[in-house]
């Protein structure tokens, strides 16, 4: 019964919002360039699907590449911080400071320094995705039981074996929690980069149709962005279940 309610209630709210939106636009005859109706947005999505997919491929390349690089860097830095308290004390404050810098300030600088091709967009994605992964994984590594580590040491385990047997599997839940957040950020990061400097991508396409006051196409583009963000998040969840199936099962128990 509770499961049905969890599905039915959000679905009901969705139907009411979309229905009310459609009714409002039709009754008050709102212009397309001010607020398109949901039916117009769906029509624009279907009619421009091929174009949207072409731009999606560009955005996905930037997003996935940035996410992979930021994950690698976050894992590396997190392990270094876990190994050395001095290193953590030295670098942790700067990780916090990076999150206070507006991405709209860095974007133009990256474009000036690195041009208008793939690199500046990937750097923006890395900048947005690195922090949640690094912080979540670092915190998870620091919470590993000392008893388990000491037990392995008593059996003669070296540092590599301790990380392989205990620390990485135990810290994986933090790593994937950060990855799920980053997976939703990465598409947004690529879009911001494309707004600032690009020749293709969903951000570039959105800016172009927005300047032409084609708001139905703007909303269609937003739907594509939401779709890819959710898909990447689900991909990370699936990867977690494949690599560490015990994690969520252990939580439920």
How would you name each of these model-derived features?
Residues 65-95:
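Transmembrane-helix boundary motif in ABC transporter permease subunits
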Residues 85, 177, 219-253:
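C-terminal transmembrane helix and the adjacent membrane-cytosol boundary/short C-terminal tail
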Residues 140-175, 206:
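Short cytoplasmic-facing helical segments at TM-TM junctions of multi-pass membrane proteins
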Residues 27-68:
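Periplasmic/extracellular loop-to-transmembrane helix junction in inner-membrane transport proteins
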Residues 5-27:
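N-terminal signal-anchor transmembrane alpha helix
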Residues 178-229, 237:
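Non-cytoplasmic
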Residues 123, 127, 160-192:
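Transmembrane alpha-helices
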Residues 96-132, 139-140:
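Generic hydrophobic transmembrane alpha-helix motif, especially the helices
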